[in-house]
């Protein structure tokens, strides 16, 4: 989740640029002898993810309370909004909760895409900070939202049940269990669903959700950059090098991906 990387630019996934300065993609220009080969991992790094919490207000105690209660979700870097609740006539149980249930569970999900970004920095930043300080902090590219949001493409539901049979994990981890395509018009996507098999199976289950945005360019989105044949097989690669003589400092290795947010689970214990 968190963009706690070694460049000290937390939350750097708001714009996709400068892969070596905004993320942990690093390595030497020249060939060196390493005990470990950092580019083997560095070629696959993104700009960093985010941890998001549902808090009543923006102060330390409220944020830490939400983290403790697990009412928290992660994103791949974009500031996507996500809610996931167990619903009933008497109460709403949020993501991160554990409860007992004696009927088929019903859920609701709402996701709203992140704001599309404008270049540069807002006027209030330039008027309150020195230019060299802005450059040092964010390379003159601040979080600078427009009035338009990225669209949510789909919502995926994952269902997990306990098992001791490791040879059939696909039966226990249904990923995805359900997929809901969205018709987002710029105001987000809301869905409801029910597990009609819960009382038949009589097995405690875990559920979590992923909200996936429409594709946008991302640093390291396709680090191998395969060339495919007509059968869809990768026949040639053009890796996104992070070091060595083939490293290109001007190449951010941008490729389209669906940025995403994924919730904390809801744990349901079957009650007879």
Residue ranges of model-derived segments:
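C-terminal functional module detector
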Residues: 1-272
